A protein has these predicted regions:
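Amphipathic alpha-helical dimerization/coiled-coil segments
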Residues: 1-27
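Conserved segment of winged-helix/HTH DNA-binding domains
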Residues: 1-11, 61-72
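A ubiquitous short alpha-helical element
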Residues: 9-17, 34-38, 58-59, 79-84
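C-terminal all-alpha effector/ligand-binding and dimerization domain
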Residues: 25-37, 45-51, 65-121
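Short basic (Lys/Arg) and small-residue
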Residues: 54
Length: 121
């Protein structure tokens, strides 16, 4: 999963569009809102919507389709391992930073932030 996400993020930093950035921003806003409201199900869905918007922005239909398939399993996994929205609140700023790096087309920064998110640092 990590290799796929990193490749998607690299490509999204190059190929992102205004629509993709808008979709990412909306998903991030919802992620923060649902995390603050302690609505785990909606928060997980918003988190996946954010990463799906990144996948849509990568410009590679195969990678996007792979992520769409993977996201079903990620949802199930997150619902098993997370009991509340605390980890989502804790990683919100990192997700904001990831979107900013993609917006800035800064591949190196986007990958660095993604690695922090993946490693829960």
């Amino acid at each position: 999963r990590h290799v796929l996400e990193l490749k998607i993020i690299e490509k999204a930093a190059v190929n992102r569009t205004a629509k993709g950035l808008k979709d990412m921003a909306l998903a991030l806003k919802n992620r923060a809102k649902y995390a603050a409201a302690e609505n785990l199900i909606a928060c997980v869905e918003a988190d996946i919507a954010f990463h799906s918007a990144i996948a849509e922005s990568c410009g590679n239909n195969i990678l996007t389709a792979l992520y769409d398939t993977l996201s079903v399993h990620v949802n199930k996994f997150f619902m098993e391992i997370y009991k509340d929205t605390t980890p989502f609140l804790a990683s919100q700023q990192q997700h904001e930073n990831l979107m900013q790096a993609i917006k800035d087309k800064n591949i190196q920064q986007a990958v660095a932030v993604a690695n922090q998110i993946i490693q829960h640092k």
